[in-house]
Design a protein with these regions (language model features):
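Hydrophobic faces of well-ordered beta-strands that scaffold small-molecule active sites
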Residues: 82-86, 125-127, 152-155, 186-188, ...
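Acidic-and-aromatic substrate-binding clefts and catalytic sites of carbohydrate-active enzymes
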Residues: 90-93, 102-108, 127-138, 160-170, ...
Length: 420
């Protein structure tokens, strides 16, 4: 078996999150070395004086590797790139995590983006969060019409209509309208299963596999519109935010990203619901964002792809996971080379400043190219002083040109109906 089953470990016990966040802000001393030597409290192996020493806050600890290894700068990719996962706009109204309405906020315009795209060899940016209705029309006019072929825009669900009794029909009609005006596909944020409720922001959570969404999936299949879906989040976001959570610092910076507790479905249950949708709609093409939020468990996402030929994945915001398991990741790329898409989850400044692993810029793309094209060792996966998703570094997978061409360009061009 290419990807042998991996057993998950026992879940850790709950530690009071509020205490931990307070400790983080105050400067927690729980990581101090053990004190030996009886009543004096002095470590007998410590010979240097401790007078004048001071504690170092974890957030200020920014070590630099002493490894002397090759450093390869890849300024342009081996082949033109279609970045299938960028956010150049966002719905202006958000209620409890649910994007609503037709008003849009724009993060950049073509005049700002095209020079970067030319420098970094990017043929096309796909703006996943293009909105609905009049907002979608405005987004397409702002990007796709101004620079044809350089931008493609996707539509989103019209969740403001969810409370209507005939929502399934209205949603299908909204997607048909989006297709007529040029939307390249449908994008779903992690709204389903985690944010959308029966009363939009009140009542029970609405499951990913709720039958009311069936016409939405079926309409996309009929129109050959790929569905780019984000379900769940990294597994660590569903575990206690304690001293054993490897993404503790990230969750401390973004406590709203934690979904640990009985009020939320488990990581496993969310992905099982997603897989049921995929199985029920074999004619619909699903692109699972962020390696399906299973980049930490490539054996499981590989099993999903084996069972469902209508599944593709993108690698956006997950080279941090792929790059710390380079041998297994390379086998994954080799096995599914026709079904993996290049994406970054890029967000322009200043909106992306808080998520450096997504901050649109030259350095972000060069890191991705270095990961994919070289066998460099132990380098940063994001342009940040402290690794934002976890304190580790990554290794390049050094893919051959025949795979790079598909990953960078051809797979996305085929799904989006673009010229080769």
């Amino acid at each position: 078996m290419m990807f042998p089953a991996i057993r998950s470990g026992r879940r850790r016990s709950l530690v009071d999150r509020r205490h931990e966040l307070t400790a983080t802000r105050a400067g927690c001393g729980c990581c101090a070395p053990p004190m030996l030597g009886g009543g004096s409290g002095k470590n007998p192996l410590q010979t240097a004086s401790t007078e004048g020493s001071s504690e170092l806050r974890l957030t200020d600890f920014q070590p630099r590797s002493m490894l002397h290894v090759p450093i390869t700068r890849v300024e342009k990719p081996a082949f033109p790139v279609i970045d299938v996962h960028t956010h150049l706009s966002w719905m202006s109204e958000t209620r409890s995590g649910v994007s609503l309405g037709e008003a849009m906020t724009y993060f950049a315009d073509p005049a700002e983006l095209l020079p970067l795209m030319d420098r970094k060899g990017i043929r096309t940016m796909v703006n996943l969060t293009g909105g609905t209705g009049r907002g979608l029309e405005e987004t397409i006019a702002r990007f796709d019409a101004v620079a044809p072929g350089r931008f493609r825009t996707m539509t989103e669900p019209s969740f403001q209509l969810f409370a209507e009794s005939d929502y399934p029909r209205l949603q299908a009609e909204a997607i048909e309208h989006a297709h007529r005006i040029g939307a390249a596909g449908l994008k779903l944020l992690k709204t389903l299963g985690l944010y959308l409720r029966e009363g939009i922001d009140q009542g029970e959570l609405v499951g990913v596999d709720d039958a009311r969404f069936a016409p939405m999936w079926e309409t996309c299949a009929a129109l050959k519109m790929p569905v780019f879906i984000h379900t769940s989040d990294p597994e660590a976001f569903f575990l206690p935010g304690n001293n054993q959570n490897e993404r503790y610092e990230e969750l401390a910076r973004h406590p709203d990203w934690s979904f640990y507790g009985p009020e939320y479905p488990s990581h496993r249950d969310l992905l099982a619901a997603r897989d049921r949708v995929i199985a029920r709609h074999p004619e619909t093409t699903f692109v699972l964002m962020h390696v399906g939020n299973q980049a930490e468990d490539l054996a499981t996402i590989a099993n999903c792809m084996e069972r469902h030929p209508n599944v593709h994945v993108d690698i956006s915001a997950r080279i941090s996971e792929l790059g710390r398991q380079p041998r297994m990741a390379r086998r994954f790329f080799e096995r599914y080379q026709d079904r993996i898409l290049f994406g970054t989850d890029a967000v322009p400044a200043p909106y992306g400043n808080d998520v450096p692993q997504q901050l649109l810029g030259d350095e972000l793309y060069e890191i991705y190219y270095r990961f994919l094209e070289t066998e460099d060792e132990y380098f940063d996966y994001a342009p940040a002083a402290v690794p934002p998703q976890g304190r580790w570094s990554i290794y390049g997978v050094g893919l051959p040109h025949e795979i790079l061409r598909k990953l960078y360009h051809d797979n996305a061009a085929r799904l989006l109906g673009m010229d080769p």
